[in-house]
């Protein structure tokens, strides 16, 4: 996910005040998901405010995400997440539930998503905690949490310390926010997510956009590259 090494060379040893020089910059991008498997936990909000269209749109988005990872890990949609990657499902309202552990079966993952029913309050802290617990078995794979929510925390402990602990343990956190009836604080999502915000947080007021946001995020996770490149030279 991003740049893992860079090297810069200049083609002269000395230079006059008005002279010019050629600077060569070599960048190595992080390998994609085929070479660098990932364990990904989709954390899905099923609180009462998600009832109706938001829940249906979230389900379609989550299933599209699963399909893209399926294809990216072995070159085709064969119903199995390949190359050592896995996906898990955690959903939350008053408390969080592990609907699917880290597995490779696309059918089982989609069944877990389809089983979700909206109702209750919004407990983000328990959602982050339960998702983090799925990574307790040692693994060399990347650890990724994708948090989807449509509103503010209304029950449970403050979620930020739990999210910070997850990041400190090596988990990368992405956030997708739907601006629901209770509103959403984007600064909170930015605080939960890994840096930089521009590539780890996406927010929309329209449930119809969710499938596209999930798809873009899946592509970002599975087909990495060098992004946000900045070159500063002072000669």
Identify the residue ranges that each predicted region occupies.
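Hydrophobic residues positioned within well-ordered beta-strands of beta-sheet architectures
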Residues: 6, 21-25, 88, 174, ...
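Short, charged loop segments at secondary-structure junctions
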Residues: 44-51, 63, 67-70, 80-133, ...
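Surface-exposed acidic, glycine-flexible loop patches that form ligand/cofactor-binding
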Residues: 15, 31-34, 67-82, 132-141, ...
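C-terminal "exit" segments of structured domains
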Residues: 2, 18, 33, 200-235
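Exposed beta-strand and adjacent loop surfaces of beta-rich binding modules
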Residues: 37, 84-86, 97, 142, ...
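Acidic, polar low-complexity linker/tail segments
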Residues: 1-41, 46-56
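VWA/integrin I-like adhesion module and closely mimicked acidic/polar interface patches used
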Residues: 54-57, 76, 115-133, 140-144, ...
């Amino acid at each position: 996910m991003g740049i893992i090494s860079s090297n810069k060379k200049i083609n002269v040893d000395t230079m006059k005040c008005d002279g010019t020089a050629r600077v060569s910059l070599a960048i190595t991008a992080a390998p994609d998901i085929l070479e660098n498997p990932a364990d990904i936990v989709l954390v899905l909000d099923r609180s009462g405010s998600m009832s109706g269209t938001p829940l249906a749109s979230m389900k379609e988005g989550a299933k599209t995400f699963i399909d893209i990872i399926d294809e990216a890990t072995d070159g085709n949609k064969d119903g199995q997440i390949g190359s050592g990657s896995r996906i898990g499902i955690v959903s939350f309202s008053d408390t969080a539930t592990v609907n699917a552990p880290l597995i490779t079966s696309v059918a089982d993952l989609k069944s877990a998503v389809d089983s979700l029913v909206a109702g209750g309050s919004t407990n983000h802290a328990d959602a982050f905690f339960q998702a983090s617990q799925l990574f307790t078995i040692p693994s060399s794979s990347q650890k990724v949490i994708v948090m989807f929510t449509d509103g503010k925390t209304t029950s449970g402990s403050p979620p930020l310390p739990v999210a910070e602990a997850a990041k400190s343990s090596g988990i990368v956190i992405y956030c997708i926010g739907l601006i629901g009836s209770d509103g959403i604080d984007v600064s909170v999502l930015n605080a939960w997510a890994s840096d930089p915000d521009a590539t780890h947080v996406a927010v929309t007021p329209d449930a119809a956009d969710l499938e596209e946001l999930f798809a873009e995020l899946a592509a970002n996770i599975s087909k990495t590259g060098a992004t946000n490149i900045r070159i500063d030279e002072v000669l």
